[in-house]
Amino acid sequence: RALAAGKVVALPRVDESSRMLELKRIVDPARDIVAGYRGLPEPATRCERVAAASIDWVLVPGIAFDRMGGRLGYGGGYYDRLLPVLPSRAARVAGAFSAQIVDAVPSAPHDITMDTVVTEAGVVFARPLAR
């Protein structure tokens, strides 16, 4: 829907040398998405790079989330390095299954919490986005 509405859609691509996520614009998913890092679908290297400063919202994966927006990632640190460089106005949204919601996830001072956590059962956590 976002592409059909003329929105710029960017997906992450792993840069193995820097261990960072590059944000790449996709226009035609059938053509622009290829097997990438560890066989995961990601934008082709030829796709245009998108500046982190232009991001309005980001969908963040994880193993578990808590009801305060805490997130337990997969251990690679890719989103831990991406989230701090996004503009503060960018909404951080986690999509998860209800089984991934726990009482509390371990956290460190550098961890960035999610603004919204959504499951198949509905919104689990949301904070106002006035930034």
Regions from the PLM with identified roles:
Residues R1-S54:
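N-terminal active-site beta-alpha-beta segment that forms phosphate/nucleotide-binding
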Residues P29, A44-R49, A53-V58, D66-G70, ...:
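Surface-exposed, charge/polar-rich loops and edge strands
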